[in-house]
Amino acid sequence: MSRTVMAFDYGTKSIGSAIGQEITGTASPLKAFKANDGIPNWDEIEKQIKEWQPNLLIVGLPTDLHGKDLDTITPRAKKFAQRLHGRFGLPVELHDERLSTTEARAELFAMGGYKALSKGNVDCQSAVIILESWFESQWG
């Protein structure tokens, strides 16, 4: 059975999201949620989850290039993941997001130049990269 999976690129000002199907291993950008010091409008996230009905949620885990936790943002991303699970009762996994923002910017710039590099676009494309990376990790 193929699962529908939703991913989030957590940030303190914006949280990008993407949706994908495990059977194809591909993802598409959804919406960037504005956050106030890392706290999103949970009603908006709930609306998106109800609309897409994912079986699993993935949250990008920010680390340094060596895979070590970053002092401020890593614990907050973990807390966001815990809150997603607590609010919606869906399984949540953390997945390495190293260099996803850099890759997202490069992809968006190649597609649309500087105009494509809005914060929301970058965050959602980062969520796509996180999700597709998670799919690849499942195929081992």
Curated annotation (Swiss-Prot):
Primary localisation category: cytoplasm
InterPro entries, per the entry: RNaseH-like_sf (IPR012337), YqgF (IPR005227), YqgF/RNaseH-like_dom (IPR006641), YqgF/RNaseH-like_dom_sf (IPR037027)
SUPFAM superfamilies noted in UniProt: Ribonuclease H-like
Keywords recorded for this protein, A-Z: Cytoplasm, Hydrolase, Nuclease, Ribosome biogenesis
Pfam families recorded: RuvX (PF03652)
One of the protein's GO biological processes: rRNA 5'-end processing
GO CC term (a single one): cytoplasm
GO molecular function: nuclease activity
EC code(s) of this entry: 3.1.-.-
Compartment(s): Cytoplasm
NCBIfam families cross-referenced by the UniProt entry: RNAse_H_YqgF
Function: Could be a nuclease involved in processing of the 5'-end of pre-16S rRNA.
Similarity section: Belongs to the YqgF nuclease family.
Name the record gives this protein: Putative pre-16S rRNA nuclease
